[in-house]
UniProtKB/Swiss-Prot annotation:
Keywords assigned by UniProt, alphabetized: Amino-acid biosynthesis, Arginine biosynthesis, Cytoplasm, Transferase
GO terms classed as biological process: arginine biosynthetic process via ornithine; citrulline biosynthetic process; L-arginine biosynthetic process
Catalytic activity: carbamoyl phosphate + L-ornithine = L-citrulline + phosphate + H(+)
Lineage, broadest ranks: Bacteria, Pseudomonadati, Thermodesulfobacteriota, Desulfuromonadia, Desulfuromonadales
Name recorded for this polypeptide: Ornithine carbamoyltransferase
Family that this chain belongs to: Belongs to the aspartate/ornithine carbamoyltransferase superfamily. OTCase family.
Length: 302
């Protein structure tokens, strides 16, 4: 039976932890120059309605390193951009490729694509979730902190797809998470409610320094996500003070690490000084998109 990677809570804790183990193994093999062609002869179709640097490069390179091939398709270059129903696209693509990664706006659209496809679907990002990124983040924490489930995590900024994904992660892995957002910019209510039912240890605040106090991991994202450019000025005013900077770091654990999914708007949600500090592991984090996604693709498509 085919399996998809749409949202963390669709998978079991054991399955998610197996991805970390496989990613670490594939990363070690890549660093050692050992071939690991687990997807030889396989093709990944990559559907993009949102532009990207890290998502496209990491999936394309990942398929190459796994011995397969990746096919880039933008919405403007396919019939989806002209109104072809998702259920038709899913069934047609299922006859051509062995898996689909989609980066788009609507989570419902991704779930519909998965419903009608007979091949694995990977959520490369929606406005609701970014599961590949949060798994890369946690792989990075594991590399730097080891006992990642015993740490306190802090999210500062917008209650966006990354915040939603971190709440899902807290529900699945059981760690403590504090989410600090301005009033009116909280995470999605359905995500909050589901995490509560799953027993997640998540605290929601409007004070970033209180959220950061003693935290082992500080994390943030841009104040205005793709598609929200017209709200930039309004959001800049609302998010003033919700920044990772020297004061935030001083409030956290002395050995804290800083995460950011990138691209960063330096001196907005995070200062240039902070992102260049010894606490920041953002480029390890960016690299780990490659390794965790290879593990996801190998698990679903091998």
């Amino acid at each position: 039976m085919k399996k998809d990677f749409l949202c963390l809570t669709d998978w079991s804790l054991e399955e998610l932890e197996n991805l970390f183990t496989l990613a670490a193994d594939l990363k070690a093999k890549q660093k050692a120059g050992e071939q690991h062609h687990l997807l030889k002869g396989k093709t990944l179709g990559m559907l993009f309605e949102k532009s990207s640097t890290r998502t496209r490069v990491s999936f394309e390179v990942g398929m190459y390193q796994l011995g397969g091939h990746a096919l880039f398709l933008s919405s403007g270059s396919t019939q989806m951009g002209r109104g072809e129903p998702i259920k038709d696209t899913g069934r047609v693509m299922s006859r051509y490729v062995d898996g689909i990664m989609i980066r788009t706006f609507s989570q419902e659209g991704v779930e519909e694509l998965a419903q009608w496809s007979t091949i694995p679907i990977i959520n490369g990002l929606t406005d609701m979730y970014h599961p590949c990124q949060v798994m890369a983040d946690l792989l990075t924490v594991i590399e730097h902190k080891k006992n990642y489930r015993d740490l306190t995590y802090c999210w500062i900024g917008d209650g966006n797809n990354m915040a939603n994904s971190w709440i899902n992660a807290a529900a699945m892995f059981g760690f403590e998470l504090r989410v600090a957002t301005p009033k009116g910019y909280e995470p999605h209510a359905l995500v909050v409610e589901r995490a509560k039912k799953l027993g997640a240890r998540v605290t929601y605040l409007n004070d970033p320094l209180e959220a950061a106090r003693g935290a082992h991991v500080l994390n943030t994202d841009v104040w205005a996500s793709m598609g929200q450019e017209e709200e930039q000025a309004k959001r800049a005013a609302a998010f003033a003070g919700f920044q990772i900077n020297a004061e935030t770091i001083a409030a956290a654990d002395p050995a804290c690490i800083l995460l950011h999914c990138l691209p960063a708007h330096r001196d907005e949600e995070i200062t240039d000084e902070a992102i260049e500090s010894s606490h920041a592991v953002v480029f390890d984090e960016a690299e780990n998109r490659l390794h965790i996604q290879k593990a996801i693709m190998a698990t679903l498509m091998a």
